[in-house]
Swiss-Prot record:
It comes from Pseudomonas fluorescens (strain Pf0-1). This is Methionyl-tRNA formyltransferase. Attaches a formyl group to the free amino group of methionyl-tRNA(fMet). The formyl group appears to play a dual role in the initiator identity of N-formylmethionyl-tRNA by promoting its recognition by IF2 and preventing the misappropriation of this tRNA by the elongation apparatus. SUPFAM superfamilies: FMT C-terminal domain-like, Formyltransferase. The gene is fmt. GO terms for cellular component: cytosol. The keyword Transferase applies. CDD domains: FMT_core_Met-tRNA-FMT_N (cd08646), Met_tRNA_FMT_C (cd08704). The keyword Nucleus does not apply.
Amino acid sequence: MTEPLRIVFAGTPEFAAEHLKALLDSPYEIVAVYTQPDRPAGRGQKLMPSPVKQLALENNIQVLQPPTLRNADAQAELAALKPDLMVVVAYGLILPQAVLDIPRLGCINSHASLLPRWRGAAPIQRAVEAGDAESGVTVMRMEAGLDTGPMLLKVVTPISAEDTGGSLHDRLAEMGPPAVVQAIAGLAAGTLEGEVQNDELATYAHKLNKDEARIDWSRPAVELERLVRAFNPWPITHSTLNGEALKVLAATLAEGKGAPGTILGASKDGLIVACGEQALCLTRLQLPGGKALNFSDLFNSRREKFATGIVLGAAVDAQ
């Protein structure tokens, strides 16, 4: 009887943990899991294990958390595991060529975009922000370059007008794992050929940062509506209202003209705010010290805060 493939898995967030779950249910042997070192989290800044580490420990799998894979000791530790294949999903550490050369069948990666579009750290959010019609998962062979390797398999999903960064993430987290299992079977059988990426079509998905989430009301409403969806659940788009932070969690396009940031009107349906082109109807907001609420609830209890003519973003920056 043929020995099962020996697989080393490397990943960190929940997206990666969903892939590890699928591999644990596959016929392959997961000999070890690599994940990033525990990080401080929450109000107490207590050290917390990654979702991948938690899942590995629950299944009695060896967990390795080197701060880097660039040194000889870390590479020797990996080689000692005698992996046939390394599966990498949102690991967060660079794998040098010396590491890529260790597994017998090389290293493969599950990337949350339709490569070569959106190489890099935030492909899901950038696809929503850009107004892309579709997204998906690409399983590829890894090279030393960032998300540049030959593509083995793609699965595609449309991006709807209601999709947020969170909803698209969750959908891709369901689609990616079976694609990885299918790709591994093809590699093991020697039936899967890689397709070289066209670098001329490549775009780069820069890492998200909070500064980007500050709403610039001079931009067209169509761009801001996509930004609101892309940055939910993190980092959440925001502005200010009478000098207080105002988080914007949902919005739709609306008709209206005025100086950018000016409140044009309010009703139970939403808060209409002028943009550089057209207007935005803010439908879900969060005020300081409160929870996120549909605007209809805020309108009933705090109507005076949203008077026509007030300019959002006119005072201090939101945090």
